[in-house]
UniProtKB/Swiss-Prot annotation:
The gene is Elba1. Residues 155-168 have a biased composition (Basic and acidic residues). Pfam families: BEN. It is found in: Nucleus. GO terms for cellular component: chromatin silencing complex; nucleus. The BEN domain mediates DNA-binding. Residues 198-209 have a biased composition (Acidic residues). Keywords: DNA-binding, Nucleus, Repressor, Transcription, Transcription regulation. This is Early boundary activity protein 1. Residues 155-242 are annotated as: Disordered.
Length: 363
């Protein structure tokens, strides 16, 4: 094994340069100074044999062949740096290593390659987990987005339903002044008096009320009751009630909300009358006349009197109204709209008669 002095001296002898034409770098100058100092060292006094000399020359030739492939000339004519020479010397030393060292290096390389494979596999598994987690997050975000879109669609549909419902209510309320005007015109029309209580839209409660002083006014028409024939129509019996569990109770539950009506009053109603007339009868049994005069079906002011200074009315109990609608739609061939129209008309009539009574009292 050659020492540092021999390696540097041998590398310097192989340099293909002319000291007069080639300018050395600072690093190369330091190399020459080191070699000159080593040449003055007397520690290397061993004499070589002929065989050793031939072997050294042969090794030198092999080293020269390999070193020449690593020595490069720069554009300015300078030689390679000290690192190139050192690399060539290390390659020469590496060729002189023992088989045990080569085996250790091979084992190290195998272990290093195995470590790299394990590292790459671990990194790939971590990336796969991240991709799966990202996929789950993306699906969750898509589900949440779908839910939000459905909520927005429902919110967009709600104003349409609400608008249609308000239009229906406004239409019902707009019919109130017309019905009041129609009823008022019928009441004050004396040219063609009507003799049918059903055509007048009056019930027994309306007929029972006679304002004070009306008997003395001969110019007012009188209501003529229907003539009783010798063969009157058979009175239809009171229908059965779904929620009437106790037949001996004086009150009958007519709907799922627990609204009760007197059993005697239900038996006294002529169920052969039209649906609106029966609705008005039952409405007077559920609410008193003062309540009907000061309440409406929706509780909203009529659009016909929006700019007028009219007192606002309250809403009828929606549970009782729902029970009445339930009874009439299940017992008779009526639609919920027909029942609500009859309720609206009855409230308008009671309010009109209340105002008439108040005007007569003020006079």
């Amino acid at each position: 094994m050659i020492n540092r002095r021999q390696r540097l001296e041998f590398a310097l002898t192989l340099l293909p340069y002319d000291p007069e034409t080639v300018q050395l770098s600072e690093t190369q100058k330091k190399v020459e100074a080191i070699i000159a100092r080593l040449r003055t060292d007397d520690s290397f006094t061993e004499e070589e044999s002929d065989d050793c000399k031939v072997r050294r020359i042969q090794d030198a030739n092999e080293f020269a062949d390999s070193a020449m492939r690593h020595i490069e000339m720069s554009d300015s004519g300078k030689l390679s740096t000290l690192e190139t020479l050192t690399l060539a010397a290390e390659k020469l030393l590496r060729t002189q290593r023992s088989p045990d060292q080569d085996f250790d290096d091979m084992v190290q390389d195998v272990e290093y390659s195995q470590l790299m494979r394990n590292t790459i596999q671990a990194v790939n598994e971590a990336r796969l987990k991240l991709l799966q987690q990202w996929e789950r997050s993306k699906r969750k975000a898509l589900d949440l987005l779908t839910i939000e879109i459905e909520k927005v669609q429902e919110m967009d549909q709600e104003p349409e339903h609400k608008q249609s419902h308000e239009q229906d209510q406004d239409q019902e309320q707009s019919s109130e002044p017309f019905n009041a005007f129609r009823d008022g015109a019928d009441e004050h029309n004396t040219s063609t008096p009507k003799t049918n209580d059903e055509d007048l839209g009056l019930d027994d409660d309306d007929e029972d009320y006679v304002p004070g002083g009306e008997e003395t006014m001969g110019n007012k028409r009188k209501r003529i009751k229907k003539p009783v024939t010798s063969t009157p129509n058979a009175k239809r019996r009171c229908p059965g009630f779904e929620f009437d569990l106790d037949g001996e109770s004086p009150m009958v539950t007519i709907g799922p909300n627990g609204t009760e009506v007197s059993r005697i009053s239900l038996s006294a109603i002529n169920w052969d009358m039209t649906g609106p007339s029966i609705t008005r009868k039952l409405l007077c049994e559920i609410f008193d006349r003062d309540t009907l005069a000061h309440h409406t079906l929706s509780g909203k002011p009529s659009p016909a009197f929006r700019d007028c200074a009219r007192p606002s009315k309250q809403q009828l109990d929606p549970l009782k109204v729902a029970d009445l609608v339930y009874l009439m739609t299940n017992s008779l061939d009526m639609t919920p709209r027909e029942v609500r129209t009859a309720i609206t008309t009855k409230c308008a009539d009671e309010n009109k008669m209340l105002r008439s009574r108040m005007q007569r009292k003020s006079k």
